[in-house]
Curated annotation (Swiss-Prot):
Annotated protein name in UniProt: Reaction center protein L chain
Subcellular location(s) per record: Cell inner membrane
Binding positions for Fe cation per the UniProt entry: H191, H231
TM region positions: 33-56, 85-113, 116-141, 171-200, 226-252
Binding site for a ubiquinone: F217
Organism: Rubrivivax gelatinosus
Recorded topology in the membrane: Multi-pass membrane protein
Function recorded in the entry: The reaction center is a membrane-bound complex that mediates the initial photochemical event in the electron transfer process of photosynthesis.
Annotated keywords: Bacteriochlorophyll, Cell inner membrane, Cell membrane, Chlorophyll, Chromophore, Electron transport, Herbicide resistance, Iron, Magnesium, Membrane, Metal-binding, Photosynthesis, Reaction center, Transmembrane, Transmembrane helix, Transport
InterPro entries, per database record: Photo_II_D1/D2_sf (IPR036854), Photo_RC_L (IPR005871), Photo_RC_L/M (IPR000484), Photo_RC_L/M_CS (IPR055265)
Amino acid sequence: MAMLSFEKKYRVRGGTLVGGDLFDFWVGPFYVGFFGVTTLFFSVLGTALIIWGASQGPTWNLWQISIAPPDLKYGLGVAPLMEGGLWQIITVCAIGAFVSWALREVEICRKLGMQYHVPIAFSFAILAYVTLVVIRPILMGAWGHGFPYGIFSHLDWVSNVGYQYLHFHYNPAHMLAITFFFTTTLAMSMHGGLILSAANPKKGEPMKTTDHEDTFFRDAVGYSIGSLGIHRLGLFLALSAAFWSAVCIVISGPFWTRGWPEWWGWWLNLPIWSQWPLN
């Protein structure tokens, strides 16, 4: 891919966290860096192990391939390779690849003199994953509480965990996470739609300005958060969705073992209406 006219002046030495100038180069438009190498290493190794694990299983059906975590009897120990050890190694590779990618983003930000909003945002996605496969299993005392790597098996795991706590959607943190996910979708789709509508006027008319965009939302909902504000809001909504997703699963089991509908007993016992019988 050809280098864009303005890119050359930004391709300067320095800003690396590890490795100095050893990996401080580009391949086409992609910056490599030490953490680019480690990202590639962990990604290739993890993918190869998944393929090898699938070859040892009963099927090549993409929907049914599954790399399962260790049995609960192994606790937090190292399991035999074909009894969950493979899952443990793949998990290490996944975390290594994700963290390496985030650190590579940090190096790119340092080179460009930018702040670290992008790697910080990506770290919230890493947090959600690590919560599922490391933090919650450790708090519950066994790697077997992690989710399997497979399409149908992962969906089964989600369903089973939900039924363990009766109605999982009564989990207050889950409610917040879903609310933030849907609100992120709404806010970003409205923002994208607004930009495209302003940038694509009728033939022969000039492209509209930020004043048109602000006025649209003032006319529509009475307030415009502004061009910079919508990006701040979008970042906040997206990070909140990832954060509360991590919270909703980590409190289920380690800190709350009963059905989630029971958690709402405090609401029914409020003195405002607890004096009246429910029936």
